[in-house]
Amino acid sequence: MSWMFLRDLLSGVNKYSTGTGWIWLAVVFVFRLLVYMVAAEHVWKDEQKEFECNSRQPGCKNVCFDDFFPISQVRLWALQLIMVSTPSLLVVLHVAYHEGREKRHRKKLYVSPGTMDGGLWYAYLISLIVKTGFEIGFLVLFYKLYDGFSVPYLIKCDLKPCPNTVDCFISKPTEKTIFILFLVITSCLCIVLNFIELSFLVLKCFIKCCLQKYLKKPQVLSV
């Protein structure tokens, strides 16, 4: 998936989002995506080639690397960015469907950008819930796969075909840890922003429903 396509996709969704949604978009692209691109190019460029073990046994280095890195950390972050962005397709598809119907019936879809009613409200709400679920799920997955969010400089490996317990060294552990912590913090920030936007939308809908019921309620005239 092209990052430019991803940007255009989310920009189209945010036409109907709240101010919190615009902040979320800025965090994703200014902090997470740009930092990811820098980290992928410079920090995780040749991670397997720079992984060293104090054993020359054929296959030992590859087995130890695969054990500690079952999936590349940088690829996992890329997958997370894609997965937290794709739920916005729900909103895009909903708007595209109604815009097509609007052209056929020559009827205005929404009063103005930022106004969400009916199906659009539900589609946007579901996309927020799914995005939040993916964010939390990937953080838990990352923590479980790598036993935390820090990269050790030394790992012990006793897997076959290693002749005994060998020491393996990871390149740039401090720099990788800093980048990972930054991405974790921005991911947590996105979760908080999603919860704020969810609360705002639900509260706004609740107040709107209460006002509508109050206005429809027949008024008793005093004599």
From Swiss-Prot:
A GO cellular component annotation here is: connexin complex
Q: Which residues cross the membrane?
A: 20-40, 76-96, 122-142, 178-198
Q: How does it sit in the membrane?
A: Multi-pass membrane protein
Functional summary from the UniProt entry: One gap junction consists of a cluster of closely packed pairs of transmembrane channels, the connexons, through which materials of low MW diffuse from one cell to a neighboring cell.
How this chain assembles, per its entry, is:
A connexon is composed of a hexamer of connexins.
One biological process term in Gene Ontology:
cell-cell signaling
On the tree of life, the source organism's domain of life is: Eukaryota
**What ranges are annotated Cytoplasmic (topological domains)?**
1-19, 97-121, 199-223
Subcellular compartments: Cell membrane; Cell junction, Gap junction
Task: State the organism of origin.
Answer: Homo sapiens (Human)
Task: Provide the tissue specificity.
Answer: Weakly expressed in placenta.
Give the keywords, sorted: Cell junction, Cell membrane, Gap junction, Membrane, Transmembrane, Transmembrane helix
State the family named in the UniProt similarity comment for this chain: Belongs to the connexin family. Beta-type (group I) subfamily.
A Pfam family:
Connexin
Query: A single GO molecular function, which one?
Result: gap junction channel activity
In Swiss-Prot or TrEMBL terms, this protein is called Gap junction beta-7 protein
> From which residue to which does any coiled coil extend?
none
- Tell me the residue ranges located in the Extracellular compartment per UniProt: 41-75, 143-177
What SMART domains does the record tag this protein with? CNX, Connexin_CCC
